Amino acid sequence: MNFPDSSLFTPNFAYENDLDFSSLITPSTRVSFQEPKPCNPVIHSAGIENDGRQNCETTMTLSEIMKGDDEPKNKRAKHKELERQRRQENTSLFKILRYLLPSQYIKGKRSSADHVLEAVNYIKDLQKKIKEVSEKRDRIKRSITHPSSRGEFSIRSLASSTCSCVGDTNIAVVVRPCLIGLEIVVSCCNRHESCLSSVLQLLAQEQCFNIVSCISTRLHQGFIHTIASEVEEGIEVYFSELQEKIIKIGTSRVTTR
């Protein structure tokens, strides 16, 4: 079988050069993919106008987003910490308050509100006691600085009854109540110089007297001793019996010389 000559199928390159195939070639669209870095991921958002053109591109890092979310959490954490510290301080202060209050004020009361109320009552009671003690102190000062006419009369009568005789051993004693408890006035001659110490020893032995003041006055014929003493609560003092004891001990001291 005879084939035609291959030269018959040779393309005419000169004619081919006149043809334009560029319109038949469709350019390939390449989409570039860039994997974001894990350490700093990026979120892209594009705003599109009405004409379809891209308006702007906003870039926000994930760390900024997380920071904005953490701000309320940080505020809540700070608030909780401050509240915890405040509660601890209040608890410690209430413990100190319970320690300072006497037991009779907080007996049977456990709530903090009751403790605060009893603390107010305790302060009022202390103020009342301070006022009473101050008034009592002022009365004692006035009685010592400005003695009453009755006291002056008693002292004068005792002084007049004091003998000037060398051999006389009598002692005049007056026991009477006063503002603070008991007042003892002893008048004696010059021979009874140790009378005051004897009376003080006697009062100390009784164990129910608390001596507050002692004033000794020297006269021409002897001495006048004025003793102010407190008496313990619940103890009854018999003035006549105490007067006899003082006279007896004063007389015995002079006799034994």
UniProtKB/Swiss-Prot annotation:
**bHLH domain sequence ranges:** 74-126
Query: Do you know which PROSITE patterns this protein is assigned to?
Result: BHLH
Q: State the compartments where it is located.
A: Nucleus
Q: In which tissues is it expressed?
A: Expressed in roots, leaves, stems, and flowers.
Q: What induces it?
A: By salicylic acid (SA).
Q: Name one GO biological process term.
A: regulation of transcription by RNA polymerase II
Q: A Pfam family in this protein? A: HLH
Protein name listed in UniProt: Transcription factor bHLH55
Q: Taxonomically, what lineage is the organism?
A: Eukaryota, Viridiplantae, Streptophyta, Embryophyta, Tracheophyta
